[in-house]
């Protein structure tokens, strides 16, 4: 009896699974979107179980080689399309309606809520408009002072290793420096991560990012309903660390809101006005200050609204900057002629004193360093994947993408395609000075900060932060090619499982 019942349930499940998928399967076949062999119910889940951050880049490169520029995977009931075809990039990224992140990222909502990264529709539009003043050039000028000061702290920390013989993994140093910058520019508080890496907020954030990164690569941990069952200890640790972060941020918000209310009460309050020449002036406006003064539909943002945006800013800014700077310094250490050109430009623009402060204007004059950063982000893009959710059938040329599908745009593989970049595996900053090369490259073949309506709102901030830190390090140290080479690893960002290793040798001061 029970055996027959079990067989009946199994048959019904298989029929249900097949009927649920059949329309999309037929559509994929007509559009010649192929992929690995699937089995009922779990789809490609067994292949996904063997996927690790360390083998992700190689595995998906193999899939592209086998199935062409676009292929599909089924993970349990979720359909995923992966593509490096620019016609998909254009249709998806230019759309004003396809703004929802791929379902792959929905587990981040417990951490980031409805912040700019995950929100859509009117909420996303309103929030983005509210955040715009934080990236006004006047605010950025004040932020550069914070970037410069914290890069100086990192340079001091590196002195203990600057003997020309010791191999240093720069990733951990850059990560703490980037966190100091993002927290101070976001909230106006100094967590002093570089001097106090065990500060509760710092430890909690690093733990949350680590766990969430592991979840992205783990089928058993990715789904919210399965996570507490598959890894209960990790689940409880994540909840505890998120609470530590939120309690800290909430406390800062309450304190800053109280200061704002007192200013309104005693008549010293000065409202934020876009276009005001003094925006970000003496008060040195932070992201938090701007959010506290903002309104949506004539209503102030709640503490939860503000915390979500602060958390997104810190989460996105810390990791992406760390990836970009670490890979740039590693590449510079392996290319002495490039390093020499950078140093000559730094002395020419910033002067011979390695401790001289930088300004936004001076950083913008570093054109060769711009090319080095661009080339780094081409070969080692901090964000190698862009995901969107397709709710309804979408026609792209002759191809139909069925609704209820997540599409993952894979710029990492575009950047290494000789169709768009000659000698794609060669680190060659000069390619960005060649007008012929840049003019012949399709616009969407290089999108380190994404493109379209949902591009990165903080890209100017990120470029300044990278230039401030790289310029400070190169003015103080010659970078040497010590340690293991890179081994690409993907979580939320691109990193290296072998570290970003260099040697350091103090520079002789130029007189």
From Swiss-Prot:
The keyword Heme applies. One of its GO terms (molecular function) is iron ion binding. InterPro entries: Cyt_P450 (IPR001128), Cyt_P450_CS (IPR017972), Cyt_P450_E_grp-IV (IPR002403), Cyt_P450_sf (IPR036396), Cytochrome_P450_Monoox (IPR050196). It is found in: Endoplasmic reticulum membrane; Microsome membrane. GO terms for biological process: mating. It is a peripheral membrane protein. One of its GO terms (cellular component) is cytoplasm. Heme binds at residue 456. Its cofactor is heme. Pfam families: p450. Transmembrane segments: none annotated. Keywords: Endoplasmic reticulum, Heme, Iron, Membrane, Metal-binding, Microsome, Monooxygenase, Oxidoreductase. Its main location: endoplasmic reticulum. Its EC number is 1.14.-.-. Belongs to the cytochrome P450 family. This is Probable cytochrome P450 4d21. The gene is Cyp4d21.
């Amino acid at each position: 009896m029970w055996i027959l019942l079990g067989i009946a349930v199994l048959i019904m499940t298989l029929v249900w699974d097949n009927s649920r998928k059949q329309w999309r399967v037929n559509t994929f076949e007509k559009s010649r979107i192929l992929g690995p062999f699937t089995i009922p119910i779990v789809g490609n889940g067994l292949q996904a179980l063997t996927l690790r951050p360390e083998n992700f880049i190689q595995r998906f490169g193999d899939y592209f080689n086998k199935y062409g520029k676009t292929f599909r995977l089924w993970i349990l009931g979720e359909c995923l399309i992966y593509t490096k075809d620019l016609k998909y990039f254009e249709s998806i990224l230019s759309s004003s309606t396809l703004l929802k992140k791929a379902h792959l990222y929905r587990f981040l909502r417990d951490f980031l809520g409805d912040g700019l990264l995950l929100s859509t529709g009117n909420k996303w539009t309103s929030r983005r408009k509210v955040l715009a003043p934080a990236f006004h050039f006047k605010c950025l000028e004040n932020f550069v002072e914070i970037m410069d000061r914290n890069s100086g702290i990192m340079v001091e920390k590196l002195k203990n290793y600057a003997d020309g013989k010791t191999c240093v993994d720069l990733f951990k140093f850059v990560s703490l420096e980037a966190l100091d910058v993002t927290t101070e520019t976001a909230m106006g508080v100094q967590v002093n991560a570089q001097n106090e890496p065990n500060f509760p907020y710092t430890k909690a954030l690093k733990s949350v990012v680590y766990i969430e990164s592991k979840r992205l690569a783990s089928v058993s941990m990715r789904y919210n309903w399965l996570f507490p069952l598959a890894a209960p200890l990790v689940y409880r640790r994540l909840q505890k660390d998120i609470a530590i972060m939120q309690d800290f941020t909430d406390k800062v918000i309450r304190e800053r809101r109280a200061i704002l209310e007192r200013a309104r009460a005693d008549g010293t309050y000065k409202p934020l006005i876009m276009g005001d020449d003094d925006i970000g002036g003496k008060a040195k406006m932070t992201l938090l200050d701007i959010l506290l003064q903002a309104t949506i539909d004539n209503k102030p943002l709640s503490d939860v609204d503000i915390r979500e945006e602060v958390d997104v800013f810190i989460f996105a800014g810390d990791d992406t900057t760390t990836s970009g700077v670490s890979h740039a310094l590693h590449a510079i250490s392996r290319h002495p002629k490039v390093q020499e050109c950078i140093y000559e430009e730094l002395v020419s623009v910033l002067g011979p004193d390695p401790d001289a402060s930088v300004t936004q204007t001076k950083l913008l004059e570093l054109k060769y360093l711009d090319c080095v950063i661009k080339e780094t982000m081409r070969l080692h893009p901090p964000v190698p994947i862009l995901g969107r959710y397709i709710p309804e059938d979408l026609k792209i040329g002759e191809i139909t993408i069925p609704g209820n599908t997540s599409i993952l745009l894979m710029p990492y593989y575009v950047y290494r395609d000789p169709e768009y970049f000659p000698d794609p595996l060669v680190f060659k900053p000069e390619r960005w000075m060649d007008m012929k090369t840049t003019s012949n490259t399709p616009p969407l073949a290089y999108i380190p900060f994404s493109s379209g309506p949902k591009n990165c709102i903080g890209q100017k901030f990120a470029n300044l932060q990278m230039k401030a830190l790289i310029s400070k390090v190169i003015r103080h140290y010659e970078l040497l090619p010590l340690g293991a080479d890179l081994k690409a690893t993907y979580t939320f960002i691109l990193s290296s499982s072998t570290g970003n290793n260099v040697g350091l040798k103090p520079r002789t001061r130029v007189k």
